[in-house]
Amino acid sequence: MKITKIETIPIRLPTRRVHQWASLTTPIGVYVIIKLHTDQGLVGLGEAPVLKDWGGDYGKYYGETPQTTVHIINDILSPALKGQDPSRFESIHALMDKAVKGYPYCKAAIDTAMYDVVGKALNVPAYQLLGGLFRERIPIAHSLGLMEIDKAVAEALQAKAEGVKTIKLKGGVDQKRDVE
């Protein structure tokens, strides 16, 4: 099995609000979906969460926007991986690192798609390739950005009503406010 092409599809999911934390304000729900195509007609799916101020050394060098993600995958990583066997995970990691420094979300999307397509080729779920099922369900958390306290309380209560058991609070702008 060989990689024939990697397709990129930028998407934006609807969100309730802009997410703000101490280091940045950014839209959330922005992703690039990838489809890793093979010569056997199988397609593996992956996704890159796009955060322009994150990646690499705290986003200092490799913040990933939808545009940079599409460029890095289409113009650098896809040509470097064309013709490669997607089941050779470590080899592909080395090829990606040789092709471009950083861009961990781009590379993670390809990595996920490789596990997906190899699992499809072997007729097993991708988690079997990673050591087997660890848990039946995955608990989720809800992240509250920086916002007025009454809005944060209302959002936390709404998340709790929706079944969320873990609430993550953001702070770091004003210590007194953070304690309150």
Located regions from the model:
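Structured beta-strand/loop patches that form or line metal/cofactor-binding pockets in enzymes
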Residues: M1-D57
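Metal- or metallocofactor-binding catalytic centers and their adjacent structured scaffolds
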Residues: K5, H37-A121
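Beta-strand segments within the central parallel beta-sheet cores of soluble alpha/beta enzyme folds
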Residues: K5, I92, Y127-G132, K170
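Glycine-rich anion/phosphate-binding loops
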Residues: T26, Y103-D111, I149-V153
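A general lysine-centric signal
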Residues: K35, K107, K168-K170
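Glycine-rich, aromatic-flanked loop segments that form ligand/cofactor-binding clefts
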Residues: Y105-C106, T112-L144
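Metal-dependent enolase-superfamily TIM-barrel catalytic cores that perform enediolate-based chemistry
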Residues: G131-E180
